[in-house]
Amino acid sequence: MAALLVPGGGAAPGLVWRRRRAAVQCAAASPSSPDPSWRTNVVSDRVSVEPSPRTIHECEADVVSGNPPAAPAAPAKAKAPPGTPVVKPLRLTSRPRRNRKSAALRDAFQETTLTPANFILPLFIHEGEEDSPIGAMPGCSRLGWRHGLIDEVYKARDVGVNSVVLFPKIPDALKSSTGDEAYNPDGLVPRAIRTLKDKFPDLVIYTDVALDPYSSDGHDGIVREDGVIMNDETVHQLCKQAVAQAEAGADVVSPSDMMDGRVGAIRTALDEAGYYHVSIMAYTAKYASAFYEPFREELDSNPRFGDKKTYQMNPENYREALLEVHADESEGADILMVKPAMPYLHVIRLLRDTSALPISAYQVSGEYSMIKAAASQGMLDEKKAILESLLCIKRAGADVILTYAALQAARWLCGEK
């Protein structure tokens, strides 16, 4: 079967991973020592059995005459180990284990399926030409926006991951108290977006809308002299940032700042600029979490003073998420997010049960790094732990997952070791 080609992007994303997955499943299903009479011809992705020289009428006549062809004997009943007590079977009307007794049955009744299409790959970018590994996040690098970024997206698409979100490391000299660099049309993020769209027209690009990477104060908003984060003035800046990203070609803008009213204001700004087609992924329930540290260290976006508790949600609160859901829905959000993911699975389920909108969840840097650290010490099986962590986020109700393990997990799902 010929590859489906996309202009500038090579084989269509997802096609390669599906082929690899099918090849692995086909190999697993093939008999290791086939009976000589079981002859197969493999042509492309089809398996055919050569017909027997005997007619159907001859075969039926044998059966009718009481001379059926030989077949394997029924398997012998397995014996219990010595010392097993002899008991009467429990009189159970239901035995749920019956539906778990084989891999085929478990697969047939599996309620949650994880695929590379469920992943959004976060990518760190900077102005340099070289890629720089991130010590606190093994397997992740700060990518040069010209070359390293392109190479990483090629790798992602090769295993079916066709969605990325960009996070910039901004030079200190470009940071200011009002974060004006955030909406520079020739800034790092707009340039990266245009470069990616030139190479991969069908790539889905998410962007981060917030001032902290651009702020000399390290906060998500403009800081008043008494330390108060100014809400409405910040929203004004965020609208300009979102429009600049949309103009560059962003598909989805993602306000992560947690300012009140920012979703509605951004929706209005995008529409007035003619970007009706650009979606908004709202960071609906973003908690003031301890799990963000590796990310903030990488982007140098830690607040220079205080913390972010006056705008991010209190980890002790649950019902408050409902207020944010209703606000974001009414203001025009297209996707709702929970961040972090694993410590807040119940909040993901709350959003899933409350809203008909798609739900995203962010497996943040601390979650990712914990698994990596434990695996490096031999405390966890890395593959099993990562895939289980992502599966439980999906099971809780997330439609898409932002995860630094997207590439690794997609390769495993493709059958690669």
From Swiss-Prot:
- Main subcellular location: plastid
> What PROSITE patterns has UniProt attached to this entry?
D_ALA_DEHYDRATASE
Q: Which residues bind 5-aminolevulinate 2?
A: S365, Y404
The metabolic or biological pathway listed in the UniProt record of this protein is: Porphyrin-containing compound metabolism; protoporphyrin-IX biosynthesis; coproporphyrinogen-III from 5-aminolevulinate: step 1/4
Q: Where is the transit peptide?
A: 1-40
Per UniProt, 5-aminolevulinate 1 binds at: R296, K308
- Keyword set includes Chloroplast: yes
Residues bound to Mg(2+): E324
Which family does the record claim for this protein?
A: Belongs to the ALAD family.
Q: How does it assemble?
A: Homooctamer.
Question: What is this protein identified as?
Answer: Delta-aminolevulinic acid dehydratase, chloroplastic
Q: What is the originating organism of this protein?
A: Selaginella martensii
